[in-house]
Amino acid sequence: MSNPEKIFYPFIKSHNKDNWAGYVSPRMGFFNMDIPDVSFGTGFLVGNRYGVMDLPHVHDGAYNFFIFTGADLDNIFDAPFEAEFFLGENGQELEQYNINKPTFVIAPPGVYHSPIYFKKVYKGFNSMIQYSGHESRRIYSDVDENGEEVERVAKSNVTPCIKDPSKLCTFCGLCFTDANETEQDAIDKMAPIHAKVVNTEKFKKYVYELKKDYHNLGDAIMNPRLSFKGREELDEAEYQFSFNIITKPCKLGDDEPVSNGQVAEFLWFSGTDVTDSWGTFDAEIEVMVGDDPDNMKPVTFSEPGVIAIPPGMWRGPITVKRADKPICFMPWYPHTKPRYKITRKMVDGKPVLVYDDETTITNPTAGDELFMQIKR
């Protein structure tokens, strides 16, 4: 079987936000480096007080996806917070969106976005930011001495440091966060942004309040859960995900191994308090994986992390052996490819692959049609 150490990835305690006043550190995150051609990386970037994150900027060749929630994921629909987010055709005309419920936001290539204004933070404000594309630089909007808009390019380890121009920028946070900042300081900092607000609602479709999903997965998972089904709910959304809060030992999925075919799968396990993601995780979990249904082996872990299933790998049940504290389990599918759920059946004494859901196949190949005929 493939190396289990390349299947489970414990979250690394990232200290790159230690200097960012108003943010929880260490930060929990995962960035795929081992599954080719799958752009996926995210983490909990958690604000623990009022503040302003970033300035209006754009990525010409990339999408940004944002998920906003409160601090307590086991109370995800009622965890309180108030934030403002901005989208615009340029950096000088911005639409303002007030967010106080779990929300998914898309910033397509070429669309200016930010700042995120942490307006009211009662315990913590969680922003999960995903980046999908081939352009890592940021382009900021400035105004020159003649009042004309000009664009300024910034990129980590390329742009000079504002505090010390002899060094390169590392986005350490020292130039745009201040431990002594007051709530009024944050309000004053937002005044120039609010002066740019227009009421065009051109980008309203990219701000989507996440819905309650009532499931039949059993009483071990809180009901309702939060889920997002990709383009079925929001055009241009590349991601599918759900927040499943597990409260007791259980088994998820069938004993029979399945494969998602050409689709990678990321299974995220963490604590439910984003201000203490490690301290609120106390569980033991086993996931069966293998290169084929005859060679399945367990991957067992007792710390927060991600199970990364490459395309073509088989997965069996997810068994929560111990859950002394609630667990946040998030399956992620970071692309728009159809998920062909494949199982193996014995037909006339021979093993064949069978699609369990033919409706996902809109343009069947000859091989697809063969498998569907076998199933029928």
Regions found by a protein language model. Give the residues of each.
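A short hydrophobic beta-strand segment most commonly corresponding to one strand
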Residues: 121-140, 308, 323-341
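A short, N-terminal "cap"/entry segment at the start of jelly-roll beta-barrel domains
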Residues: 1-57, 150-257, 360-376
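A short beta-loop-beta micro-motif enriched in histidine and acidic residues
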Residues: 50-65, 73-81, 250-266, 274-283
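Short linear proline/tyrosine/threonine-rich motifs used for host-factor recruitment
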Residues: 149, 345, 351-355
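A short beta-strand-loop-beta hairpin characteristic of the jelly-roll/cupin
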Residues: 68-100, 138-140, 269-302, 340-343
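Extracellular structured ligand-interaction cores
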Residues: 62-66, 80-82, 112, 124-126, ...
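Conserved metal-binding segment of the jelly-roll/cupin
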Residues: 91-92, 96-119, 291-321
